Amino acid sequence: LIGILFFSFYVGTFNYDLNVNPGLVSKLTALAANPALAWVLPTALFLMFIGGAGKSAMFPLHIWLPDAMEGPTPVSALIHAATMVVAGVFQVASLLPIYVQFGAQEQLHWIAWIAAFTAFYAAAVACTQRDIKRGLAFSTISQIAYMLVALGVCFYDSRNGSFNSAEYLHHGGLGYMAAMFHLFTHAMFKALLFLC
């Protein structure tokens, strides 16, 4: 919430869609070009990611999801598939053009590292669970983290160790498509797993 309020205070709108709100591009460009306020956009975007990380159960905010599996199975299906855990992934995906075009690519780097650690940690913990629902919860955490890894690394140029927004249409599009495809397939099959 602090990141959203911080962002809207400096930009003047809650509408983050660059296609619908053409005035947002000029405001973000001016904000990124101002040396005194260059910290505002990366800070606001990272704070928004922290909020999404809590919803998507990223490490260290992952504790709530395995404990939520005590509920009825249809509730577990909704939490895993459609409503709660995919909110953070969708948030990062919808803000991806702002991350890339306006100099907040370093935050994508942090998102990728946090998500990669979460993916391996949750997968290892899932293998040690004796309760099937807790194992599925950690499996979901791992899969959500893989989606965020795809979004976080899709603009990283390994040739020179920096981000390159010129490759947005090809490489960035592939990472975005991989994350969104995995989001939909995971939602479909995890819901079927719980409900069938």
Spans of model-derived segments:
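...captures the hydrophobic TM-helix bundle architecture rather than a specific catalytic motif
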Residues: L1-C196
